[in-house]
Structures are given as C-alpha cells and as structure tokens.
Amino acid sequence: MQHTFRLLLISAMAALAVIGCETSLDGNLNENQTPNTSLTIDNIEIDDGNRLSSRVNISWWGDDPDGYVDGYEYAISDTTEGNWRFTTRTDSVFILPISPGEEIEDVLFAVRAIDNEGAADPSAASIEFPLRNSDPVTELNTLELPPDTTFTIASFGWAISDPDGLPTVRSTEIAINDTLNGWVEIPIEAEDQQELFISVDISQEGADEGVADIYLGRNYRDTELQVSGFEFDQLNTFYVRTTDAALATSEIQSHEWYLKRQTSNVLILNDDASSSSLENLVFTRDRLSAIGISSDVIDISDGEGFGSGGVVPLSNAFPRIINPTLNRALAEWDHIYWMSSSLRRNINYAPEILSRFFDNNGTLFFNALSRVQDSSNPLLNFLPIQAYVSIDASRGENGFRIQNNYEVRPASGQGTVLLYNAGRNTGIWPFVPFDEEDALYEAELLKTFITGNLERYEGPSTVAAINPEGNLIFFGIPMIDFMDNGAEGDIEAVLQELLINRLGFSTQQ
C-alpha cells in the first residue's frame, strides 16, 4: 500500500515538472513610438508691407504616446542632420538670419521632440517666417567727440543698435575724409556691446597726410590698427557706419573739426578772459620768441559764469573726456606757459588734466594775478602756496595794493628788478610758499584799510614761487603789467631765468 502511494506521488511530481518546463509568454514586444511636436503658430499669412523683423518669439510643445519628452531639437533654414541644436526649453526669442544682400526673405524654423529613448519626431513641426531686414543704426555721442580744434590726439564715441537685435550687427567702421576707400573696421568686443570709444594718435611724419594709430576704450588699448587720410591745418571729417549680417548699412554719421599741426614742444594756454586777452597773447608770444622759444597756442578763454565752487566750467576748447583724451593731448608738449585772468578759471582743473604731463617730466609756468583764496580751496594744494598772508581786520585792514613804479624784486636779492606799470591794483595778495627757498619774487606793496587809508607793508610779500618738486612756477602778477617803453628787455631777462634756467623750457620740435 505504501509502495503504491509512493509511485503515484513520484508520477504527479514528474508531470508538474514537465508542465513547468513548457510554460512561456505568448505575443510580440511593442516597439517605441516616436514623439509628436507642435508649434503654437503653424502658419503666417501677411502681405510684404507687414513682414516681421528678424527678432521673433517662438514657442512649441511635444508629447510622447509611450513615454515622455526629454527635450527638443531645432533648426533654422537648413534641416539636414548636423544642423539641429538641442534644448529643453519650449519657447525662446530667436534672431532669424536673412541672407546677405537680401532685404526680405522667408526663413524656415523647424523643431522636433526627442523622447526618453532618444527617438526624434520624424515629421518635425515647421513654419516659414516672412521677414524684412531692418537697417542698423549709428549715433554719435556728442560728449565724446573732438572740440572745434585739436592737435594730434583726438577721440570719438558712438553707439550702435539694430531693431532686429544687437547680435545681427556684423561690423562698425570709421573713415577720415574718404568714404570710398578709407573705411577701417573697429572691433566689437562683445555681442551685446552698444557703446564704442576710440582714440587716435596722429603721426606728423608725412608731409601732407597724417596716419593715426587707433586705441580702444577709456583704458587706451592698442589695436595695431591704423587709419589714414588726416589733413593738417585743415578741416577734417570723421565718418562712422554700421553693417548688419544681411549687409544692410546704417546711415553714415559724421563730425567735422580742425586739425592743427604741432610745431613746438612749448604750449601756451591762453586762459585770459579779459578784454585785453589778444593783446596779452601777442605780448607773451613776442617775449618768448625773443628768448628763442616758439610756441603752439590753445585758447581756453571761453566760458561765462561760474559753475561748481565758483569755478568757470572746463573750457569747450578742451575735449570733454579728460582721461585718456585731454590728459594725453596736453602731455604731447614738454612745457606749458599758462596765462589766466583769474584763479577761478581753468587752472582749477590742472591737477587732473595735467597728471600725465607731469608724469612725463613736463614743466609749467602759471601767470595770473595772486588773489586771496579760501584756505580749503584744493588749488592751494597744486600751486606753491602754503597760505595767503593774513590781515588784521580789527585794525580795519582789508587788503593790499601795488601801484605804478613799485618794484617786484628777486627774493634772493640777485637778478632783474621789474617795475609795475598797470596803474593801481587793489586785488593783489602776497602769499607764503612751502619753503623760504621756494620764494622767487617779492613785491613792494601797500596795505589798505576800509577807511581808505594806506600804509607801507613790511611783512612777507612773496608774489612768485616754485613748488618743491621744481616743475611748477606761479608768478602772481601778469607779465604784461610790467610793460613799458624799454621794459621788454627786463621782462625777457626774468623769463629767461624762470622758464629756461629754472624750468628747462626749450624749443625742440
């Protein structure tokens, strides 16, 4: 009985084993289905007069029947493999390219979804955009252009834009006097760059035409580029234009200015705004010529009223851009003779505009009437004036006066004595230099009182001094105030001592 049961159990187990070995899944494995893609707008119908700009906002979406969309690929114009770009976005702003030389064009945009298995929509969604190219725009920056007249350093600033977007701008070019063959491309250093600023350093080696090195930006970066066509002692015209990717060109912008040839390494800055300005300039040039010094001249006597701190605004004869333009322009000379009718004029900008000039070992002679200034005036940190001589208001003192035939003597006691010859001047004020040895000339003066009384002044009477560095002399009485028949020789002797012997003025050009 047990034997029979054992046989039946073994037989049942064997049958189950056979059945288990033959069990399997029936049917076919489903293949991956490709995703689908749709554009928000799939057709644009407009007439030619209303064509779109090349800057367009495009959006799309996709779905996948058996998985999910992992991203998208898009192509512009050319949909052959290798021209598709991947993105996970479903919208973006595109600048669609118009073929060079074409004003209007239908540009194809196609997009296809990519699913989680890397399969692409075989029938990508596409649309043709009817486009019209917009011309780029060039605008001059009036604050970054040369003044009416310059010598060999000048700067130019302009802005570029394009209604189709800055990335469509291909180039911007400049020319000097010649718009047929003189164009030079200026580097655009960033895709979103709108403002351009260049400086030119014009060589005078050519007899008739000047060639300039071009420098980029406010930090004066060398480009190894040059532009030619400059004409000395004549009006010159700067031209600038911008071209886009479709080769459309902006309206040409231009600026005209007079270019002077530098003839000397000595510059006269005429800051005399008085009615005698021209007479003073002629007198000064004649005196310099008599001691062998030729000169160039910049007239900075313009400007009406007073701006910040009671100081006249910086002369319009100077470039608006101080650094690098004005700093480098003034540093082209080795010596400057600065004559002025007031200490409230352009001399107040000298520390800033002459920084490169002094770095290049330049020397300055400044000639203006010495008038008392507030002790907080920054000008006193520039001129060789430690302080102005004080007066005793409790006694009714109110100032000083010099008058005809009063002596202006060398502080050392040795040298030429000058005689004042400009009538009565109650505006003069003596000062104290930083060091007693820095004093160069002292004046015979009267002290004035509010009562109208006068008394001879016996105190410190310095009216001319040199700074401790030895590169700046301030002479506090205008040289023309010593002019008299036969006095020219004395004035020239003083200038010989101060300009040539002290400051090293010489003419080498």
Model region roles, listed by residue range:
Residues 83-92, 185-191, 214-220:
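Short beta-strand segments within Ig-like beta-sandwich modules, predominantly Fibronectin type-III
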Residues 276-376:
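Helical hinge/lid and interdomain linker segments adjacent to catalytic or ligand-binding clefts
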Residues 397-471, 476-483:
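Catalytic beta-strand/loop cores that center a nucleophilic Ser/Cys/Thr
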Residues 338-428:
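A glycine-rich, often tryptophan-bearing local segment used as a flexible ligand/cofactor-contacting loop or short
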Residues 63-79, 161-186:
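Solvent-exposed loop/turn segments flanking beta-strands in beta-repeat/beta-sandwich domains
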Residues 97-106, 227-234:
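Surface-exposed, short loops/turns at beta-strand junctions within beta-sandwich domains
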Residues 14-48, 119, 509:
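Bacterial Sec-dependent N-terminal signal peptides
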Residues 113, 242-244:
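Conserved structural position at the C-terminal beta-strand
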